[in-house]
Amino acid sequence: VLPQGRFNNTSDKQIREFIAEHCRILAVVGLHGNVFKPHTGIKTSVLLIQKWDEKLCPKIDDYPIFFATMQEKSKDNSGEKIFVRKKDFINSAIIESDVNLVAEPIDHYEANPISLDEYLLDSHGHLIVKHDLFNHDGLTKDGISEAFAEFAKKEKLSFFL
């Protein structure tokens, strides 16, 4: 995880060249600026890399890279987590014992739960933070993680064979 400037600044060209020389860049995922709030509001990116290796990852010059940007902010501007509410799933009948009936969520959320009865809980009874990084227990939409897994399979990356 690096501040986004490290990937863009001309003064950091040496870092980019070092990474490209020693690793295959698998993915670059831009995180929302609120992810690390309240500690910092600097926009960051996650760089997924695989060290060049003759057997597992032979060096090649031209290859595709997965790019994605987090759209759901997961925290408000003060750094408070935003949780998924039951009423955001209008098209489904949410039953306490069967959370698998949840349909596609609507993208309207509020932070700081008032009553736990209003919020969607995962299979462990925990609140679900709104984000688009991965599908949470099958209760939320597929996210960046699932898209990367499909990319990795399509590209026949060694860790998905």
Where are these regions (language model features)?
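A conserved structural/catalytic subdomain of Rossmann-like adenosyl-cofactor enzymes
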Residues: 2-161
